[in-house]
């Protein structure tokens, strides 16, 4: 589970690791087969390389296929079906209301043999001038920023309204170069837009960064050695000894590290309890107090 990256900063060290994040929605246990449908109209996109449009609509076929692939890769459902044929084939412009009716949801579910429908309803792309910065290049690069706003609705048969709606924004950038066109922006933005709903719909892993205290006494130094060997249980044992033996700020730092240990072990209640112990020991107005306050908000 842990991929660690350690960097020194006085007695503070940083560590990064993968942490499982919960989804924003819970599905009924009976939902094992799902379908992703393309609920967007087909709009022609210019391949003009000289003038870029400020407002664009995404490619439903590209987006729905990418969303189905992204969901299938998580291995959360037994089966993911893609229905990328155009559901709104006759639409010439995006509809204001694209919510599926109960009858449409029922028929789609029966025809496709699924328990749930994920309807990719729209991708709005707003472009504006931007800049890119590269570490080894001294000057900013002219770019186009694309503000991407996908909308995905989740349906279960026999419900009066969607179970869940994902309507989030994100931004990606393209370096301005001769091959850049509306068509390229729409294709790549549509592929990227399909990644946005997944973290809201399904449990996923995110890399998170945390601080811990290293050194200052023999127990904390030994714990740091164990931690760099990825031996969290032995590190915890040394922190616990330090907490019981030491006083003042050394005791506070041991409590803070024990809170991290319990977070790693997915024991949220114990992590909060030990963070609270550290908070009671910290000096008012110190950097340590700011650090604990930051974690208390998370």
Language-model segments: residues:
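Sec-dependent signal peptide recognition
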Residues: 1-2
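C-terminal motif of bacterial Sec signal peptides marking the signal peptidase cleavage site
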Residues: 5-8
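C-terminal/domain-edge helix-coil "capping" segments
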Residues: 10-31, 153-298
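A general structural signal for short secondary-structure junctions and capping/turn motifs
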Residues: 25-27, 108-111, 142-145
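N-terminal segment of the mature soluble domain
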Residues: 30, 36-119, 159-164, 286-287, ...
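Flexible, glycine- and charge-enriched loops at secondary-structure boundaries
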Residues: 53, 57, 141, 183
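Short, hydrophobic/amphipathic alpha-helical packing segments
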Residues: 64, 102, 148, 190-198
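Amphipathic beta-strand/beta-sheet edge segments enriched in Tyr/Trp
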Residues: 119-176
